[in-house]
Amino acid sequence: YRLLTALTLGTLLWGCTESGKKAEGPFYIDIESRAQLHDWFRYAPERPIVVSGHRGGMVTGYPENCIESFEKTLSMMPSFFEIDPRLTKDSVIVLMHDATIDRTTTGTGRVSDYTCEELQQFFLKDREGNVTPYRIPTLEECIVWSRGKTILNLDIKDVPLEVMSDFINRLAPANVMYTVRNARQARTYLDRDPQAMFSCWCKNMKEFGEYAEERIPWSQMMAYVGTMMLPDQQELYGKLHEKGVMCMISLAPT
């Protein structure tokens, strides 16, 4: 309850000025270098709560994994976004959480059964199933749009690690980070991109030790610790904070 109250309050505070008046958006986060990205996620006890838009936000009329939805969220508060890259039949990286397009578009079938051009015939749907005028974006379109506006956290689905790493290295965006589920994944990315920033699954002291063993720089990670802060994991949170690592929980239903 306390955490939810703090999150709600933090969200409200983002939209207010010192005079108590509502600030007007958009609320952009301008990251110009990897070093600045690392610093942005540095833990400090006095720092206000940071909000991550799960799949970009889920406002009625605005679909998940959609640039227009990201803009809508940023019109209300500063946020970084967790998004879901997938490969099309012709190896273009697009944004889609599910393996199929049934739930979130007017089409049916697997993402990998369509070329990127073929996917553009379908319209995205919001969380209530309402059809919107928006279409499936490519990851490259999203990255180009995001520069000077926000941070993108890639929760990679079926894109091979080497393909994604080469893609990111080619575009060299300062404001993009990777979600990794274990230390070995982080090390593999780091070997190909030494300045990479990570959202690391780190839910217990065993996993904490594995990141240390793989020599993942603490300055280049944020720790996803689960759906809530647990009393029996206080040692973990303390160790992460000692290393300057920000902890993240998820309040999204899926």
Predicted segments with their positions:
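Positively charged n-region of N-terminal signal peptides that target proteins for export
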Residues: 1-2
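Phosphate-group recognition and catalysis centered on beta-loop-alpha active-site segments
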Residues: 16-254
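Bacterial N-terminal signal peptides
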Residues: 5-12
